[in-house]
C-alpha cells in the first residue's frame, strides 16, 4: 500500500500477533502532490537511493511544490483491534538543497518557515516537533482511558 496508515496498521498488527501483546508502531510518509504522492511510505528506501538533487530534478518542470508529511501512530492488540492516530503537515519543496541531513531534510520547508528543515535552529525544530507530539498525546489519553 502507498498509504502510511495502512502500512503502520499492518506492521503494528503483525508485531502484536507475533509478540502476543499490544504494540505501538509509528510510520511516516512524504507525499509530493505533483509526483502522484511519491515517495509515500517508502521514505527510508528513497533516502538510501536518491539524493536531494535527484528529487529536485524530478520537480524541475513542475509548478506545484506542495508536499504532505503524514505520520501514523498505531496501537494494535493481538486480537486484531487497532487504533490509529494521524498527523498531516503541509510543506513546500525548495528549489535547491541546503544544509546537511537526509534527502528530504535538505529540501522540505515546513509551513511558516522560509528555509529547509536542515537549516532550522533547535527552537524551530522543537516548534515543529510539538505539532507531531499531538498524536502521541492522543495515544497516551486513549491508553489511560482504556
Where are these regions (language model features)?
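Anionic-ligand binding patches
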Residues: 1-146
Amino acid at each position: 500500500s502507498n498509504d502510511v496508515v495502512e502500512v503502520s496498521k499492518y506492521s503494528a498488527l503483525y508485531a502484536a500477533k507475533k509478540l502476543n501483546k499490544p504494540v505501538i508502531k509509528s510510520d511516516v510518509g512524504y507525499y509530493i502532490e505533483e509526483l502522484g504522492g511519491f515517495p509515500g511510505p517508502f521514505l527510508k528506501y528513497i533516502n538510501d537511493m536518491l539524493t536531494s538533487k535527484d528529487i529536485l530534478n524530478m520537480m524541475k518542470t513542475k509548478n506545484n511544490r506542495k508536499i504532505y508529511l503524514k505520520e501514523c501512530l498505531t496501537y494494535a492488540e493481538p486480537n486484531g483491534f487497532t487504533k490509529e492516530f494521524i498527523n498531516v503537515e503541509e510543506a513546500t519543496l525548495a528549489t535547491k538543497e541546503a544544509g546537511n541531513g537526509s534527502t528530504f531534510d535538505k529540501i522540505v520547508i515546513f509551513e511558516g518557515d522560509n528555509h529547509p528543515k536542515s537549516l532550522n535552529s533547535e527552537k524551530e525544530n522543537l516548534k515543529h516537533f510539538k505539532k507531531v507530539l499531538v498524536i502521541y498525546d492522543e495515544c497516551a489519553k486513549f491508553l489511560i482511558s482504556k
